[in-house]
Amino acid sequence: MAHKKGGGSTRNGRDSRAKRLGVKRYDGQFVPAGSVLVRQRGTVFRPGRNVGMGRDYTLFALIDGYVKFEPISRDKRRVSVYPEPVGRTLPAPAGSATA
């Protein structure tokens, strides 16, 4: 007579891979055109000046420039790229000549 029940099976034990969402380039950073700025689900961050939005809501730079995060409302923000730094003096990008 068996004194232990059968082990049975479980329906757990699976998980999906992480999607690597989030902000990829930060405020004040210099970015070349085409750089991914934010990967997101839905529009937590809205595209601003010189920023495009992909089919999956990815925001990317349309021009070379400096990233700027701007508030829209309490829970929404806009990401823009400006050719010149906004609001503060930043060092020149690597490889540029200084006079």
Curated annotation (Swiss-Prot):
Residues 1-21 are annotated as: Disordered. InterPro entries: Ribosomal_bL27, Ribosomal_bL27_CS. Transmembrane segments: none annotated. Gene3D superfamilies: 2.40.50.100. GO terms for biological process: translation. Pfam families: Ribosomal_L27. Keywords: Ribonucleoprotein, Ribosomal protein. PROSITE patterns: RIBOSOMAL_L27 (PS00831). GO terms for cellular component: cytosolic large ribosomal subunit. Signal peptide: none annotated. It comes from the Bacteria. One of its GO terms (molecular function) is structural constituent of ribosome. HAMAP family: Ribosomal_bL27. Belongs to the bacterial ribosomal protein bL27 family. This is Large ribosomal subunit protein bL27. It comes from Thermomicrobium roseum (strain ATCC 27502 / DSM 5159 / P-2).
